Amino acid sequence: MAERFSSRLADVIRRPLITEKATRALEMNQYTFEVDPRAAKPDIKAAVEHLFDVKVIGVSTMNPPRRTRRVGRFAGRRSQVKKAVVRLAEGNSIQLFPES
């Protein structure tokens, strides 16, 4: 695991991504998260296993292109994001939606 995240695994995962595609992937025991752009796959795996107490069998990552945003005549770019799709072992799950 990379040195930069060894003491603070909670900083690797920023938030879960809830989209139509990510919701469909939940049926196949795959969860989608927005993660720190500097995080490597072993960092993401260790963070998910530590935070949610589950067994991870695979991690896929993607770096979508940054998007340009305008405010009046000034153009800027949104911050870099990295998405990770985490596959869990059979019988494991993460409670994303609280029971009410």
UniProtKB/Swiss-Prot annotation:
Which GO molecular function annotations are given, in alphabetical order?
Answer: rRNA binding; structural constituent of ribosome
Q: Name the InterPro entries for this protein.
A: Nucleotide-bd_a/b_plait_sf (IPR012677), Ribosomal_uL23-like (IPR013025), Ribosomal_uL23/eL15/eS24_sf (IPR012678), Ribosomal_uL23_CS (IPR001014)
**Coiled coil where?**
none
Record's keyword terms, sorted: Ribonucleoprotein, Ribosomal protein, RNA-binding, rRNA-binding
* GO term, biological process aspect, one: translation
UniProt-listed PROSITE patterns: RIBOSOMAL_L23 (PS00050)
Function field? One of the early assembly proteins it binds 23S rRNA. One of the proteins that surrounds the polypeptide exit tunnel on the outside of the ribosome. Forms the main docking site for trigger factor binding to the ribosome.
Instruction: Give the family, as the similarity comment puts it.
Output: Belongs to the universal ribosomal protein uL23 family.
Subunit organization: Part of the 50S ribosomal subunit. Contacts protein L29, and trigger factor when it is bound to the ribosome.
NCBIfam families, sorted? PRK05738.1-3, PRK05738.2-4, PRK05738.3-1, PRK05738.3-2, PRK05738.3-4
Q: What is this protein's record name?
A: Large ribosomal subunit protein uL23
The primary gene name is rplW
